Amino acid sequence: MNKIICNPLNLEYRYQIKKSGKEAVFREAADPTMLLFKGRYLMFVSMSGGFWHSDDLYSWEFHETPELPIYDYAPDVREVNGKVVFSASKRDEPCSFFVSGDPLNEPFTAVSVTFPFWDPATFQDDDGRVYFYWGCTNTEPIWGIEIDPATMQPIGEKVGLFGGNEDKYGWERKGENNKGAPPRSDAEIEMMVTHFMASIPPGAEAPSKEEMAKTIRHHLDNNRPYIEGAYMTKHNGKYYLQYAGPGTECNVYSDGVYVGDAPLGPFTYQEHNPFSSKPGGFIPAAGHGSTFQDKAGNWWHVSTMGISVNENFERRIGLFPCDFDGDGTMYCNQNFADYPFRLPDGKRGDMDTTQPAMILLSYNAKPEASSAQDGYASDKAADENVRTWWAAETNGKGEWLKLDLGEVFEVNAVQLNFADHKIPMPENWEKDAKKSMMEQRLILVKPQRTRFLLEGSEDGTNWHILKDCRNADTDFSHDFICFDGSTKLRFIKVSHIELPFNAVPAVSGLRVFGKGAGTAPAAVTEVDAPRTEERMNILLKWKPSANADGYNVRYGIAEDKLYSSWQVYGKSELDLSMIGKASGYYIAVDSFNRNGVTEGKVIFVS
């Protein structure tokens, strides 16, 4: 059986209700740690109230863990001496370690209380010694220390391993497309302080306004990258210490890696960096994750993808092929990384492919809808941008959305992406919320309910059902429907939409996949690629290819290492900002449309 999946992963992402200056109801799953334990994949993610588990990386089930601190960010799980060790983040008080010999059947129990940390990562070396890494600031390095495997208590002193270096590594620069925001004005600082002070729950110990202003200026006003999300992988005797930056709300949120000969370094920056990045396409970002091997020995990287519209921490999970080349370079294949791809049956044979398993057919398809709110027109469901969406005027069952692909295609799959559109705060939610000085938050561990009817047609008159969820009790906000073979379709329609909290129907992507029978676009051969004076950007501009829907810009430090990519739609230029100052780059601009992908000519920029 072909097992085909599509990012973001098709999970029942949990909602939370949050008040921290602003109020928001949104879904969040982030900072994933994946562990293959006793033949089963365990995936722990932030703000979910438990973990997902799977036998095959294809079908996932959820297991609640009320015994764990579910409101603590960045849960880490690793196997230590045959048991699963769990830790998560607390910045201002000592953190606990928890252990279970069988997380599906045996609750976790606390084994020790250690010290405050954020974004933890545990690693047991081949000799049985255990090391611990942590850090999540724009002012301090990633830290490492040896710990006792029995008590999890520190052995010796912590070591600063590395920090941010945005003056050398362009991808670490904060901001959308690595363009940092200008410094905040005194008025903006005062407004942030006022909002924060007003959000402190009654009775909570509060800092003075002067202390709060100082903290905000120190952490938020310097535009330095957040260096965070450590994770250690050992391969062929080398230690690969991974980290995330520059900020989870940015499309350029990525994972980089330093390499060393010992668990606590010294570490050297890998020239190919970031090794996991996805700044373009439908849903951006591929940072703060973990690296693991599947049952066949294939390497994978699972990480955080971003929406960040309703709230900065509105995030999802992505899974990407990963490997180490003959030189020991760690890299991912993230070409068309939000298109469907096949899970390998045994050893992977297509690690370096530039061709997706299926092609997108719905980009800029002609839309029609029952109604639409101002600024949320139906074309937003086909613009390949998860941050924009169609929203109906009412939450009635009579609302619908339809796409016309323009001609009949052999369709293999549909990904139906729902958005959370201006959900009002539920009444009396605060009574069950977890309260702190910074915020009030309530995780809804039980899934909500998402219902719809998906239909297809060749002529727009005679319709047949593709998926009927009108009576479902599931909650898949990024539902991926892969057909057994293909079906001929020109029109796709979603109706009878019922979303959680009685929200109005909203769709960020009605994405249709297959492959056309026509001609792929011509190759891109003429590319201008001046490099900026500070050498941190390459300003790419190319001659458009006739009939292209978009371009996949591949780049890397050698002609046989075009490991990074940036997918763009509707334009023929790109400010390539995720490069290292000291490196030269090989670049190819591949063109694509409904009929396929054509590789571009490789150029070199010194």
Identify the function of each model-found stretch.
Residues 576-598:
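Beta-strand-rich modules
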Residues 504-505, 509, 592-606:
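Extracellular fibronectin type III
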Residues 1-222, 234-239, 244-281, 296, ...:
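Beta-rich carbohydrate-recognition and catalytic domains
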Residues 473-478, 567-575:
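Short, solvent-exposed loop/turn segments in extracellular or other extracytoplasmic domains
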Residues 455, 547-570:
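Extracellular low-complexity, O-glycosylation-prone stalks/linkers
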